[in-house]
Amino acid sequence: LGLSVLFISSNIALAAAVCSNLGILYSGEIVESGSAKDILQNPQHCYTKAFLSCLPTPEKKGMVMTAVPGRMPDPLMKPEGCKFHPRCSQCEQICRETRPMLHTIGNSHAVACHIVAPLDGEKLRTGE
């Protein structure tokens, strides 16, 4: 149809049912984008992984639900570098200092993360 619709929701199951492609936002910035199937089955950004791990699933029935650790940054005082770095379990010094750019890591998958590098699809740790 050649139709584009901006559908904003924190209900990722609904968004995936309605949309063929997703853009994951954190603190007003796209941190990951790609096909709904790819993002749900192979999330790359630490925020996407943390967000998806908090969602209720049949396998988690009866378990205590968790939240993404930490707090959202104040919109008027956002941190330098990656906006998710204060909450990220894989944060490195570069994450604190330099804002990551959106890099293509697959046919239609892109991520803004210093920990995930677009080098032959391999994950790299910075500072090693």
What are the functions of these language-model segments?
Residues 1-2, 13:
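Helical segment within the ABC ATPase nucleotide-binding domain
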Residues 2-8:
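Conserved H-loop
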Residues 10-11, 51:
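Catalytic "switch" loops of ABC-type ATPases
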Residues 15-17:
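A short, surface-exposed alpha-helical micro-motif characterized by mixed small hydrophobic
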Residues 21, 33:
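Short, glycine/charged-rich "phosphate-handling" switch motifs in NTP-dependent
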Residues 25:
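Catalytic metal- and UDP-sugar-binding loop of GT-A-like glycosyltransferases, i.e.
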Residues 35-128:
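Charged, flexible cofactor/metal-binding loops and thiol motifs
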